[in-house]
Amino acid sequence: MARKHTFPSLKRAEILECIDGLGIPFTAKELDQPTSKAVIPLYEEFLDLFMGLTRQNLEEKVNSLQDSVENFEIIHESLRFTVFYQILSQFMQNICFHDFTIQDLLKPDRNRLQLILSAVINFAKLREERLQQFDDDIQKRESLLETYTLLDAQRKDLEEKVLLSQDRKLESEAIIKQNEERNEEMFQSLIEDKRLCSQVRTEYDRIRMEASELKIRYHNVDSLMASTLEEIEKLQSSIVHSPEKLKGKIADTSLRIQNDRSQQVELDKKSKILHTKLNSLQLIEGDLNACLKVLEECLVELDKLEHATVLLSTNQELCDQIEINKKKLEFRKEQLLKQLSNAQEKLEHEQHSRNQKLEAAKQRMDNIREEYKVITQERNKKIQETEKKNAMIEMTEQKIAGMREELESQISSITMEFEKLKSHVELYIAELLRNLRSSNS
């Protein structure tokens, strides 16, 4: 027994026109002589158009079964066909075509294909008519998705900045630690150099004092030698003729000369020592200048250290601010996700309510069709009776006239009843649409 469907069957020309309007390539020959190779791509286009399931999405669903299925490469095509059939069957159930079978894919029949395409086209028309009722929800959903995408991109950007700041912070801390260690070493070296400088200055002052004393003594010796030479010249003028006295004076003079010579040798030695110490002092003075230059470099490094410390503090504040912004963005993201979830739940609830009301309306239409069928059968019976009475018109003309009037009155009452039922149905559908609009708003 053929299953009854709630949608009207469309004509061949109308089906081809609607499919062409959807932008799907499908010829009249493929509709009249359908094959599996022709209908499977057509159904794939329907899934892509109405469910957003592309061939790539289908491959991803099949590939997700790779870990749970043995010999995946061998049965890949069979798995793909099975998954495709399951999704397509679910789609057919949703558009009220409940007797879709695998034969419709493998060995499609012309009449069933025409019926299936009628179901899809009627669903597309109904979807297009009802789509305006959900425009606000769709726009809100798209707006929320765009906001979520933007916030997610900002969150990733901030995370990258935080990671970069943390890396810079670690590098700055390592550089600061190295600078602190180097500054500590240089500070200790400066303290030692300062101590050595003070010792060298003390030694230098002592040597200068000794040099000045030696210069004074040297001048004294020179003056003494000059006076001695003068005395010798005086003595030469007054030569002593007594040998004993002469020998005594000679001995005294020799002794004085030897003493002067020894003093001169000592003075020469001290002068050489002083020259050596002066050279050492000059070298020490060069070392002191180098130490002063190192000290200036240390001061520059200390300034750099202070600048790096200020920069580190600024980066730390920036990192803290970024963390605060990150937490705010995460909180905002959770709020948006909750709003999106609530909107989706509301949309699903509205769709479920709409489906229930549509099912009720379809059931009512089925009942009306059954009643109309019964009325039509009764009308056919009356017509048959009328034909029999027309055959006997010569015998019972008056009786036939009366029955004809009675039949016409019954037909008019039936027509009026049908019109009433039709007006009730239209009123019910209008009330249903108004309730749907009020529930959506």
Swiss-Prot record:
Query: Which GO biological process categories is it annotated with?
Result: attachment of mitotic spindle microtubules to kinetochore; attachment of spindle microtubules to kinetochore; cell division; chromosome segregation; initial meiotic spindle pole body separation; initial mitotic spindle pole body separation; kinetochore organization; meiotic centromere clustering
Q: Report keywords, A-Z.
A: Cell cycle, Cell division, Centromere, Chromosome, Coiled coil, Cytoplasm, Cytoskeleton, Kinetochore, Meiosis, Mitosis, Nucleus, Phosphoprotein
Q: Which residues carry this modification: Phosphoserine?
A: S143, S242
User: Which ranges of the sequence are coiled-coil?
Assistant: 51-80, 128-186, 316-426
| Domain of life, source organism | Eukaryota
Location in the cell reads: Nucleus; Chromosome, Centromere, Kinetochore; Cytoplasm, Cytoskeleton, Microtubule organizing center, Spindle pole body
Tagged with keyword Phosphoprotein: yes
GO CC terms of this entry: chromosome, centromeric region; condensed chromosome, centromeric region; cytoplasm; kinetochore; meiotic spindle pole body; Ndc80 complex; nucleus
- The UniProt record lists the keyword Transcription regulation: no
Cystine links in this protein are none
Q: Entry's InterPro entries?
A: Kinetochore_Nuf2_N, Nuf2_DHR10-like, Nuf2_N_sf
Family of this protein? Belongs to the NUF2 family.
- PANTHER family membership: KINETOCHORE PROTEIN NUF2, MEMBRALIN/KINETOCHORE PROTEIN NUF2
Q: This protein is called what?
A: Kinetochore protein nuf2
